[in-house]
Swiss-Prot record:
Protein name (record): Lipoyl synthase
Coiled coil stretches, renumbered: none
UniProt subcellular location: Cytoplasm
Organism: Halorhodospira halophila (strain DSM 244 / SL1)
SMART domains: Elp3
Listed GO MF terms: 4 iron, 4 sulfur cluster binding; lipoate synthase activity; metal ion binding
Gene Ontology CC: cytoplasm
Binding site for [4Fe-4S] cluster 1: C71, C76, C82, S312
Reaction catalysed by this enzyme: [[Fe-S] cluster scaffold protein carrying a second [4Fe-4S](2+) cluster] + N(6)-octanoyl-L-lysyl-[protein] + 2 oxidized [2Fe-2S]-[ferredoxin] + 2 S-adenosyl-L-methionine + 4 H(+) = [[Fe-S] cluster scaffold protein] + N(6)-[(R)-dihydrolipoyl]-L-lysyl-[protein] + 4 Fe(3+) + 2 hydrogen sulfide + 2 5'-deoxyadenosine + 2 L-methionine + 2 reduced [2Fe-2S]-[ferredoxin]
Gene from which the chain derives: lipA
UniProt cross-references to PANTHER family, sorted A to Z: LIPOYL SYNTHASE, LIPOYL SYNTHASE, MITOCHONDRIAL
Amino acid sequence: MSEFKGIPVSSGSVVERDGVRTIKDGVKRRDDGQGAVRRRKPQWLKARAPGGEGYRSVRGIVHDHHLSTVCEESHCPNLGECWSHGTATFMVLGSVCTRTCRFCSVDTGNPKGRLDPQEPEHCAESVRLMGLRYVVLTSVDRDDLPDGGAEHYAQCVRAIKADNPDTAVEALTPDFRGDEEAVRTVVDSGLEVFAHNVEVVRRLSPQVRDPRAGYEQSLAVLQVAKRLRPGVLTKSSLMVGLGETDAEIDEAFDDLLRAEVDIVTLGQYLQPTRNHLPVERFVSPDEFEALRQEGLRRGFREVVAGPLVRSSYRADRVLEGNNVGLPSVGPDVG
């Protein structure tokens, strides 16, 4: 049984999903019925409930095309807001992850090499139907595939570009086990923004992320992407509220800058279920603004920080000020 600061985070619930046995919500339920204490959320973390015509339209398009969204799979607090505005972040390579990170609620298991050959086409058609000029793709980790799913990921980007030539694409990728050729496959697919998350500060990475992930490996992936395609914007994200210090956040900023990352997002870690890691503290909006200003002072081209900010939250609005080298674009994607 794994522990985080003495709190067990494993044991129980296996379900069948798409013909694959998975651990629901990414971590097993505790046998003793106990879990980490869930802190009461402050008022500034209250999110909009799903509903409205825009929400129903997006839900219909996503489900009709058998697509997964990180909005649903990760229990994103912004789902109601983003879907009501007609946007979503597509999760490719299926909905079952081969890794078990202790902050994440995506189901885990072994997909045994399964891929949906129609997924690139369905992504492209959904982007067209939603009228998006900026779209974010993300994915689960696929350690069961030799290339980590890089070629399928690139096919999705190319299909979107073929049907929607004026649409900018951001790819929020896994680490592909640090494989440079896999990174090259995705970064050469025609995207505008390559994103990969370090997730947490260096000290917490071994306790929070799957053992196959790593802080240094994530930095290397970002650095390789920039080296291979200097004109592509690179982006990463940090969660806060897991016990990190301000000095450790500053260190992470410096590490990301050395990896030539252009854009950083920072958001509050929220515990998906009682079986996931506990929240150590809630960071106030004023503290997030101070972190944003510190990141800008250190040299990032843009920093997006706030309690409900997630990697892909209103991603295109980062570009609206034209300070990152791309023109302003239209409807945003969750």
